[in-house]
Regions:
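Serine-esterase "nucleophile elbow" of acetyl-processing enzymes
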Residues: 21-66, 83-93
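Short, intrinsically disordered low-complexity segments
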Residues: 1-2, 40
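Conserved phosphate-coordination/catalytic loops
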Residues: 7, 43, 75-78
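Generic detector of leucine side chains in alpha-helical contexts
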Residues: 8, 13-16, 52, 73, ...
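Charged, often glycine-rich, active-site loop that binds/positions anionic groups
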Residues: 72-84, 88
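Short beta->alpha junction loops
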Residues: 66-72
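Bacterial Sec-dependent signal peptides at the C-terminal "C-region" and cleavage site
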Residues: 3-5, 11-24
Length: 94
């Protein structure tokens, strides 16, 4: 019984160690409401995708693909959706 408990403890520790090093990516897609805006000092406008990273630690990466003036159709037709699909991995979010 002690061996089973020891093996179980080792397994749980190994699982915790591997999961703690994994990062999760949140891919932001959309229009101007989420898009990156230039000129931070002179432009008070911010898309929500710009500030999202501030709500997470270093285990979560926010990858913002939002672009001003885009619709779902133009996002797909311009190949922007494919770029996200090519990079997404299990455990990521869009």
């Amino acid at each position: 019984m002690k061996k089973i408990k020891a093996i179980l403890c080792v397994f749980i520790l190994a699982l915790l160690m591997t999961s703690s090093t994994k990062t999760t990516t949140i891919f932001v897609i959309g229009d101007s409401t989420a898009a990156e805006k230039g000129g931070f000092r002179n432009n008070p406008e911010r898309g929500w995708g710009m500030v999202l990273q501030g709500f997470f630690d270093d285990k979560v990466i926010v990858d913002n693909h939002a672009v001003n003036g885009r619709s779902s159709l133009s996002f797909i037709n311009e190949g922007r959706w494919k770029k996200v699909l090519d990079r997404i991995k299990p455990g990521d979010y869009v």
